[in-house]
Amino acid sequence: MSYIPGQPVTAVVQRVEIHKLRQGENLILGFSIGGGIDQDPSQNPFSEDKTDKVNGWDMTMVTHDQARKRLTKRSEEVVRLLVTRQSLQKAVQQSMLS
Amino acid sequence: MQDRLHILEDLNMLYIRQMALSLEDTELQRKLDHEIRMREGACKLLAACSQREQALEATKSLLVCNSRILSYMGELQRRKEAQVLGKTGRRPSDSGPPAERSPCRGRVCISDLRIPLMWKDTEYFKNKGDLHRWAVFLLLQLGEHIQDTEMILVDRTLTDISFQSNVLFAEAGPDFELRLELYGACVEEEGALTGAPKRLATKLSSSLGRSSGRRVRASLDSAGGSGSSPILLPTPAVGGPRYHLLAHTTLTLAAVQDGFRTHDLTLASHEENPAWLPLYGSVCCRLAAQPLCMTQPTASGTLRVQPAGEMQNWAQVHGVLKGTNLFCYRRPEDADTGEEPLLTIAINKETRVRAGELDQALGRPFTLSISNQYGDDEVTHTLQTESREALQSWMEALWQLFFDMSQWKQCCDEIMKIETPASRKPPQALAKQGSLYHEMAIEPLDDIAAVTDILTQREGTRLETPPPWLAMFTDQPALPNPCSPASVAPAPAWTHPLPWGRPRTFSLDAVPPDHSPRARSVAPLPPQRSPRTRGLCSKGQPRTWLQSPV
C-alpha cells in the first residue's frame, strides 16, 4: 500500500535475544536467513520475521552478504535482533481492546 | 378470588402512596411512583405477549419491579418508624457523648459474574428429544437498591452462565450486604408434552395429578420471587412463565478484592422444580469497592511544610488530602491542572500523626507532624497550619481518614478500578450463546496470532486501516518452494490475516539445514520461480533469493 522500499518506515517490533550455540569451534545461531536489499523479494517463500536491526546495526538496507556477515561475527556470542512480523499488529490491537 | 386480590392490591398501592406523601420524602416517593408505573406497563405487556421469549422478558421486568416496590416499601416503613419514635420519645442519647464517627460511603461494583454448571448425562436428557432451555438472570440487592442483569438463555451446551453486566451501587457503607439471587424459568411451556413421544405422554397424563400438584406447590412457594407474598403483589398472568429462585448468596466487605474470586452459592431449588438447573454451587465474580475517601479530596488548605531533615526551609504549599496521600502543590490551581505536587506524604495505616508540641519551642504554633516508617528509617514531615481552627480541621480530617481506612480495610490499600457500566442494550434476538470454551479449538503448535485472532473476532474487530508497515508483508507469494535447500526456523507461511485455520509448517518438506561453516552462501533458486524476469533484460533487477545458515 504505502510502503516504498528504500524509504524510512515506522513499524511495531519485537526484541529477540539469541545466544549462539557452539558447534565444533564455531558459534552458530541455528537458523538461516534469506533476502537482502539485493535480492528479489517475490521469490521469498515465507513472509514472517523481517529483521530490522542486529546488535545495533541497521539491517533495513543491507545486501544478503552484509546481513550474513553481521550475524556471524566470531567475537559476538549474543545476537540482539529487532524483528517485525504481522502478528505483532494483532497483538497491539488486542491490547488496545482490553 | 381474583377480584379480592385486585382490591387488596389497589388498597396496598394507595397505602404506599399515602405513606410516601406523609413522609414528604420526595426522592423515595418519586422512585416508588416510577416503579408502580413500570409495573403497570409490564403487566399490560405481559398480557399482550404472544411469544414465549417476550413473555419471559416481561415477566422478568415485572419481578424486578415487584422487588423494588417491596424494598422501597420496607424503607418507607423504617423511615416512618424512625420519624415517629423521634417525635414521641426523648432520646436518651441527647445528653450523652457526641455522635459516633461514621465511615465514608463508597461505590461497590460487581462484574464478570460467572456461574459454572454441572451437566450429567442422565436419563433425563436422553428421554427428552429436544434441547431443554432455561432463561436465567441475577437480581442484586444492596440496601434498598435493586438491580438486575440481562437475561441469558441456557442449555446443556453451556459450561457456565456468564453475565456481561457491570452492576454498580453508589451509596454503600463498609458494612454493606450485597444479596445475589439467581432466577430461572423454562423457555418451553411448563408441563408441555408436545415434544414427548405418545407412550410417554399417556403415562405422564395419567399421573398428572401428583406431579402437577407438586409443581403447582413449587410454583406457589416461589411466586414472584424474593419473598414477596402473593397477596400483596400478585402476578396477574397465571398462565405466563414463572421464575423460580434457584440460588442465592450474600457478599460483604470480606469478599471485596481487585481480582476474581469464587464464592459459594446456597442452592434454593431441588430437582422437582420445573426450572431446576444443575448448578455447580459457586459463583465467580470481581467485587470491587471504591470508598469516597480514596477518590475524593477530604481536606485542603494552605500549609507550611518543613521538608524532612532540613531545619529552616519552610515552604508554603497548598495541601490536598486525598486517598492515602497528602499532596502538597505549589499553588492551589496545580491540583486541578494535573501538575506534579512539590511533595507527597504517604498516609496509611502505619502512619503516626501528632499535633503541636514539636515546634512550639521554635515559635511556630499550630503544627502537626506526620511520621512514616520506611524500612529502618523513620521519616517525619512537619506541617504548620494557619490557625488553631485550621489545625483542628486538619486533625479531624486525618482522624476521619484513619477511621475510614480501618473500616474499609483492603479497599484503602490501593484504588480499585471501577468501570462505569455502559447503559445496557435492549435485549437482542435471543440466539443460543456459546461459551468461549467451544469457540477455542487450539492445536498444540499454535502461534500467539491464533489466539489473538479468536479473541479479536469475539470482541468485534475494530475497523482500522492497517498501518503502513504491514504492506511489507503483502507482496509475497503463498506457495513454498520445494527446492529450497534450507529452511527458516519460525515458519508458518501466512501472507495476510487468515480466518483461523491450522497453520502449515514447511520445515517438514524441506531438507534439514546444513550448519557447516561456509564462507559463501547456497546456490540461488532456479530462475523459473520468477516469471517477472523471464525473457526480460532488466539490468538492475535482482534475480535471486539467497538463503544462508548463520
UniProtKB/Swiss-Prot annotation, chain A:
Keyword annotations of the record = Acetylation, Cell membrane, Cytoplasm, Membrane, Nucleus, Wnt signaling pathway
Tell me which GO cellular component terms the UniProt record holds: cytoplasm; nucleus; plasma membrane
Q: Where is the PDZ domain?
A: 12-87
Q: Where in the cell is it found?
A: Cytoplasm; Nucleus; Cell membrane
Keyword Membrane among UniProt keywords: yes
**Primary residence:** cytoplasm
Annotated membrane topology: Peripheral membrane protein
Q: Name one GO molecular function term.
A: beta-catenin binding
**SUPFAM superfamilies reported for this sequence:** PDZ domain-like
Residues that bear N-acetylserine: S2
Q: Kindly give the Gene3D superfamilies that the UniProt entry links to this protein.
A: 2.30.42.10
Give any single GO term for biological process. Answer: Wnt signaling pathway
> What is known about the tissue distribution of this protein?
Detected in kidney distal convoluted tubules (at protein level).
Quaternary structure and partners: Interacts (via its PDZ domain) with GLS2. Interacts (via its PDZ domain) with RTKN (via the C-terminal region); this interaction facilitates Rho-mediated activation of the FOS serum response element (SRE). Interacts (via PDZ domain) with ARHGEF16. Interacts (via PDZ domain) with KCNJ4 (via C-terminus). Competes with LIN7A for KCNJ4 binding. Interacts (via its PDZ domain) with CTNNB1; this interaction inhibits the transcriptional activity of CTNNB1. Interacts with ADGRB2.
Role, per record: May regulate a number of protein-protein interactions by competing for PDZ domain binding sites. Binds CTNNB1 and may thereby act as an inhibitor of the Wnt signaling pathway. Competes with LIN7A for KCNJ4 binding, and thereby promotes KCNJ4 internalization. May play a role in the Rho signaling pathway.
Q: Name it.
A: Tax1-binding protein 3
